């Protein structure tokens, strides 16, 4: 048997499917201040009287990340960019950012060296601001991540305990503005999403549901709950995707 739960704008809907047959449905009102409670409420209604050992797969949609971004409730992140020549980061609408010298070209060759004193000064400014999350993104870092890694190395010495996310680890695509935005949002939502995912895992364990859990992505594909911890932004528009499908 398969379970699907969709957190919608008005109701949270759940369905239990056995083969090609819909065995049971359930729904509860959606409380946008308690999305986890909505999911579990619908789940409890759905599995009442059901042998949970026969459940083979659980697929969830969630608007958690979408809501965090839309309501500006994400964690603060210092965005550090190494754009190189030919771009103006102010055109990207990424919010405040720190711009560093240095450049890697499209072949992965260094054409402009980093300025270490500039990096240390940037780290000092971040430390003074009290922000403990730093996203570092270079224009062609997916070709050669050396600059991102060097910036991370220097900043981690000045910002011990801070979480530093590097653009080339988040995405291998060439689109620099999109990679910068994705890296920033990944770091800004990761901790809240991890708490949400952990709560789901524990709740299913308490209900003796051992089936693998998947999160619906915006493209209609699914991602294992554990795998989604590294890329919570993959769940943006998870809810609307479920509505369309």
Where are the regions a protein language model picked out?
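N-terminally biased helix-coil "hinge/interface" segments that flank
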Residues: 1-245
